[in-house]
Amino acid sequence: MKNVLVRSAARALLGGGGRSYYRQLSTAAIVEQRHQHGGGAFGSFHLRRMSTLPEVKDQHSEEKKNEVNGTSNAVVTSYWGITRPKVRREDGTEWPWNCFMPWDSYHSDVSIDVTKHHTPKSLTDKVAFRAVKFLRVLSDIYFKERYGCHAMMLETIAAVPGMVGGMLLHLKSLRKFQHSGGWIKALLEEAENERMHLMTMVELVKPSWHERLLIFTAQGVFFNAFFVFYLLSPKAAHRFVGYLEEEAVISYTQHLNAIESGKVENVPAPAIAIDYWRLPKDATLKDVVTVIRADEAHHRDVNHFASDIHHQGKELKEAPAPIGYH
């Protein structure tokens, strides 16, 4: 065994590694001690463990190095198991939108009656109707025949009531431990639908800086005012929105007339509109305005229906919510 130790020391010194020499020397000593105690198998196992420790450390350091080098190109959200599903259109092409999925798209019911009007009866109805008419006069004075900008401003405001109503019903449901009858979902769907109208209009109209400032101011004022309004009287608030949607239908009808008369160019429909409303590939602005007008008519009916429920002295949860009713 002494000869083994001498040969090991010589190999280590010739290999130029004093550090390796001590490692091999200590390993050989351990083997000798184990063999003397009759533990040959365990000694060989210990030799293997001792000899691979530096390699394990090197392997771990290499893995860490690779991880550091790879983090710059890695998607952070994948760490949490959140990855974008591979979604495709019906024709097999890749779905390009993150803001909505194919199952969120739909065919708008353009057969809806766009001429319906709720005749004001009660005091709250008349106040709501007059308030909307006053706002309509102001918007007509400012935008005149700039239908695209008018629609963009309208959608910025119209997307607020559904969010406010849905949020307050959500808080009420949590506070009173009660179901909403589906009305939270219905109102939030309305808000999302109005937002998609706006995203479509932004593809067609590029607002100027002063129009952006006006939208920013109007949205801030309207959100807070409608929040208080809904707290005080949901009945009047829904009636107000119903009349607001009636005016939206009128505005889009005027927009359609301008397209048909040639005052407004009938440009190709944006790609987002084609996918959201499942329009044909050759759809035009006229098709987009037509489906948006139909959506507004549906919102009109939903909000007048909600106000009627309150007028009967009932809560919204007592009537079926029009879920999926764009």
Curated annotation (Swiss-Prot):
Protein's cellular compartments: Mitochondrion inner membrane
Keywords: Disulfide bond, Electron transport, Iron, Membrane, Metal-binding, Mitochondrion, Mitochondrion inner membrane, Oxidoreductase, Respiratory chain, Transit peptide, Transmembrane, Transmembrane helix, Transport
Cofactor binding remark: Binds 2 iron ions per subunit.
Membrane protein topology class: Multi-pass membrane protein
A single GO BP: alternative respiration
Main localization of the protein described in the UniProt heading: mitochondrion
GO molecular function: alternative oxidase activity; metal ion binding; superoxide-generating NADPH oxidase activity; ubiquinol:oxygen oxidoreductase activity
PANTHER family, per database record: ALTERNATIVE OXIDASE (PTHR31803), ALTERNATIVE OXIDASE 3, MITOCHONDRIAL (PTHR31803:SF20)
Function: Catalyzes the cyanide-resistant oxidation of ubiquinol and the reduction of molecular oxygen to water, but does not translocate protons and consequently is not linked to oxidative phosphorylation. May increase respiration when the cytochrome respiratory pathway is restricted, or in response to low temperatures.
Protein name: Alternative oxidase 3, mitochondrial
Organism listed in the record: Glycine max (Soybean)
Taxonomic placement: Eukaryota, Viridiplantae, Streptophyta, Embryophyta, Tracheophyta
